[in-house]
Amino acid sequence: MAFSEELRELAERVSNWGRWGDDDQAGTGNLLTPEAARRGAACVVDGAALPLALPLLGEGKGVQVGQPAGRLNAVLTFTTMNERDPMAPGIWTGCDDQLTMSTSAGTHIDALSHVAYDDLLYNNRSTDTIGAASGATWCGAEQLRPISTRAILADVPRTLGIDWMEPGQAVTADVLDACIERAGVAPEPGDVLLIRTGDVRYYLNGDRRRYAVGEN
């Protein structure tokens, strides 16, 4: 399905192609500056860490359900089990293992080479820059900047006075503005916006397919 003319015009208006030069491969990652990192560090009050991870292993726990095709949940294989090191006999034993998984098996960050439109990647480069043997020679994951910055939580359900968003309910610019106003924080270049929809309830209630692909 082709993009509408309205969406094309919007994309051109907010495009960052050429903003940091024609040879740039980091995009808005260029905004992740030392100043942005210091701004994030200055927000720490009590140092509490909030885990956001979901299980990758275990029957019925991985988030992948076979759609899109080729995305598999992680498979754990033990390669050594309580084996003695021949270089240190009688001193210690160890275990080792390996994970076989799709790179999209769980939470991840897409490189700018992940998707294209009209056969063009970020900064007007052809998808011909991607090969099965060479990988992405333009905008590969190695071009991603380290992320150490301030995050702003846009809690959509709480802002709208609901428990979670329903299928088909849009997160509009006005909704995000209301979330940010509620958070009481003025966004600055290099900040990260964390959008909560409440959709994880499907996963927690055992409906992995609804969580993964948005349908029953």
Question: PLM features: residue spans?
Answer:
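Active-/binding-site microenvironments in catalytic and ligand-binding cores
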Residues: 1-216
